[in-house]
Amino acid sequence: MDIIGGQHLRQMWDDLADVYGHKTALICESSGGVVNRYSYLELNQEINRTANLFYTLGIRKGDKVALHLDNCPEFIFCWFGLAKIGAIMVPINARLLREESTWILQNSQACLLVTSAQFYPMYQQIQQEDASQLRHICLIDMALPADDGVSSFTQLKNQQPATLCYAPPLSTDDTAEILFTSGTTSRPKGVVITHYNLRFAGYYSAWQCALRDDDVYLTVMPAFHIDCQCTAAMAAFSAGATFVLVEKYSARAFWGQVQKYRATITECIPMMIRTLMVQPPSANDRQHRLREVMFYLNLSEQEKDAFCERFGVRLLTSYGMTETIVGIIGDRPGDKRRWPSIGRAGFCYEAEIRDDHNRPLPAGELGEICIKGVPGKTIFKEYFLNPKATAKVLEADGWLHTGDTGYRDEEGFFYFVDRRCNMIKRGGENVSCVELENIIATHPKIQDIVVVGIKDSIRDEAIKAFVVLNEGETLSEEEFFCFCEQNMAKFKVPSYLEIRKDLPRNCSGKIIRKNLK
């Protein structure tokens, strides 16, 4: 069954420009407060100019182009400009340093890079000292003299015609993007995403939050992340809505931005909710038009209730990962919600809980969350040049092993427990890091928390807690361990405590646990 009607991304943008014309498609706000607005017609023209720019630089169908950018209009131009000529976008996490960025360049086979002045010095070093196929760099925010290896993106783009000059045959099965996973526990893998994947993601995510063309979807999630691309941008564009892309998240500025742009949909991660809650209460806290807040794991019930009560919002839970493209389990429009459930399987998907022998488990039994989709259509196609890793998680019949532990109830609601790799084995007992973190997060002095397992010669693993305190607070070990003993089983109480100023997180707010072990 072809849900997207055989339409690739080039056809999508040509149709959107025809249908929505002068309606606002994209608003970008920089950290300095500069705002750029584009109608659907104007945005399609900018995308065409960018596609023509890449063509003049020798980019052809199947070539890989890396983007190392913060949230900005140019990211959107490049993403869809590359897709229009059949080239492949390779977004690089803007927080990565030289070694990790070099690794992605080399393993993606990118031959051209689009970046900004902020990151350019690092890539000068990479070009000079590291082996890669990179032959050209475009800088989005610098006027440059002619140079064999570097060009001004803006100058070149503005010289291009607004109609597409190169339009090779495209298929919805063509690769549109290679998105490298966050690599919180190991080297990132290149997730291959097709035109079909992105088109489907737009329709699916628009369905999930009942998006209309009069909606305004605001996000502060990084554009190089799957959530921003598939849950927000593709959903907004597919519905003919307005997409607001804010360069960087600021707890102090967030509600003002929601109000200014009259946003009706936004998305949040736990880090955002916790930092918003420590802002001083304001009479404007409920002065917004938000209908839904798309939410991704994990939050305690106490934190959820406090946030919803203060800001007058409700959370629409969505569970997924880069490999699933969208939130394949989640709350549904018009359906009941059952916190702390992550929801039920969405349309076009099946979900099961399986044991260690890959056998389905009944309701109430703990096991691995497994999802069935269609590779290259409703879930990722494969890991780039890594068939062994692909075979490890993706079965031939489309069942994807998520590596997450959970269970389901009799009505088909699923419950996330933890990443399997985050389960601590302590003296014969399995302890969920997330469970402990949700309990410890309710301590009034604690702003942020993560627990990890560390080697223990007697009990397999001991539990260590890393906490960040609220400003001006102090916390003794005695007070901390007493709190834990009163709120969790004895075998779950951490053995060690370390108080830190911050915790290492990736772009989507996930703790980088390998940096703490």
From Swiss-Prot:
Keywords: Ligase
SUPFAM superfamilies found in the cross-reference section: Acetyl-CoA synthetase-like
Record-given protein name: Crotonobetaine/carnitine--CoA ligase
Domain of life from the UniProt record: Bacteria
Class of the enzyme per the UniProt entry, highest EC level: ligase
HAMAP family registered for this protein in UniProt: CaiC
Keyword check for Lipid metabolism: no
GO molecular function, one term: carnitine-CoA ligase activity
Entry annotated with the keyword Hydrolase: no
EC numbers on record: 6.2.1.48
InterPro entries noted in UniProt: AMP-bd_C, AMP-bd_C_sf, AMP-binding_CS, AMP-dep_synth/lig_dom, ANL_N_sf, CaiC
Catalysed reaction, written as an equation: 4-(trimethylamino)butanoate + ATP + CoA = 4-(trimethylamino)butanoyl-CoA + AMP + diphosphate; crotonobetaine + ATP + CoA = crotonobetainyl-CoA + AMP + diphosphate; (R)-carnitine + ATP + CoA = (R)-carnitinyl-CoA + AMP + diphosphate
UniProt function note: Catalyzes the transfer of CoA to carnitine, generating the initial carnitinyl-CoA needed for the CaiB reaction cycle. Also has activity toward crotonobetaine and gamma-butyrobetaine.
Provenance organism: Escherichia coli O1:K1 / APEC
Biological processes, Gene Ontology terms: carnitine metabolic process; fatty acid metabolic process
Organism taxonomic ancestry: Bacteria, Pseudomonadati, Pseudomonadota, Gammaproteobacteria, Enterobacterales
Similarity annotation: Belongs to the ATP-dependent AMP-binding enzyme family.
Pathway it works in: Amine and polyamine metabolism; carnitine metabolism
